[in-house]
Amino acid sequence: MKVKGMRWWVLGLIVLVTIINYLDRNTLGIMWAKIVEDLGLINTEGLSEAEFNDLSKKLFRDINMVFMVAYGLSQMFSGKIYDKIGTRRGFTISALVWGISDLLTSLTTGVKGIASARAGLGLGVAGPWPGAVKSNAEWFPQKERAMAQGFFNAGASIGAILAPILIAVIYAAVGWKWTFVAIGVLAPLWVIPWLIVNKKGPKEHPWITDKERDYIISGQPECNVKSDKGLSWGQLLSKRKSYAVILGRFFLDPIWWMFVTWLPIYLGQKYGMDIKQLASHIWIPYVGAALGSLAGGWMSGFFMRKGKSVGFSRKAAILIGASILLPSLVFVAFVQDPMVAVSVMAIILFGYQFTINNIQTLPGDMYTGKSIGSLAGLGGAAATLGTILSMLFIPMLTAGDNWTPFFIMGASLVPLSLICVFLFGGKIEHDALVENNTKQ
């Protein structure tokens, strides 16, 4: 049996599991207020509403810090693991770990149980990020990789769009405990079609047509086709251009996590939204994110089709996205109307995904073979570290329900990321010589 467009079937399954990934991530934040109430996580005696909100934010931050530490460690090691065992087994392990962890949250009765379940979730949900970069480098010619990465990132945004709606509907029907079960079971179920479809890589897959196989391989750098051994972390860290990814993501990724983690809390505390009201508002910013993912991938591909170099194409797209992101973050800091706020946030996340999509593609542009997942993992670990450090300040910055400093902090991170990408990136091309030397 031969299947036309096999690479798109593989990518489609990765997009699907990314949607599921973001459903699992968002369960806690959307239902947080009700979980705090039902489990009595905060003693409300003698507390004003503002004091209760501050304590709730601190507790939510602490639990998410546990999640982020696990997520960061997983990002760092998942890249190496995916490089070693391949994307087929790598995605399988990740999906099983995070799905079971989210499902087990339904059994928790206190802060320690919730934190433990979120740690397991963090270990699992991190894997697809270095895994997708590696899979796209294997399955797509270079000119299509940013678009493939755009579809992957759009999956995260679609998951974030669907999460408040699905979670609110399931919660209204069966309560928060069974909502964790219903969402948690999806990732293990996804493993079944994944193992059936993704049998081998494009060079050996029995279903791929000869035409598509030749198209993929001929569109990849020659060193990528021949390379079979990757660089060590030490070798990657010794090269200046690696820091375009590592530091670029260290500064930029916290902006995404500010919204993913804190947007439900922000809308709930500033505008008094309950779960149903959140469901009708919180999806709007992620529509912008999904469109930005696709537009950012298309833009760099457009430049390459016009004959521009890979380096010019990626950097131009990064600069365009950042020019949308930065002023929008400053503007939203002073908005008071909830509909205006979420609409501007759609522009913010459009610019963010436009930018990060091209930064995330850089490992496949700079290195080859079994180095791609490793650098993507190091970049993800740095991104998590930056997010953890920024989260430490958020309860302090938003004390008294003043969220303006929250957005100003996000705006300050954009130029720092740009400086790192342009300062360290240099000429973006594959480091074939170093990788080939590792074989000798």
Functional labels for PLM-detected ranges:
Residues M31-L73:
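Extracellular/periplasmic helix-loop-helix junction of adjacent transmembrane segments
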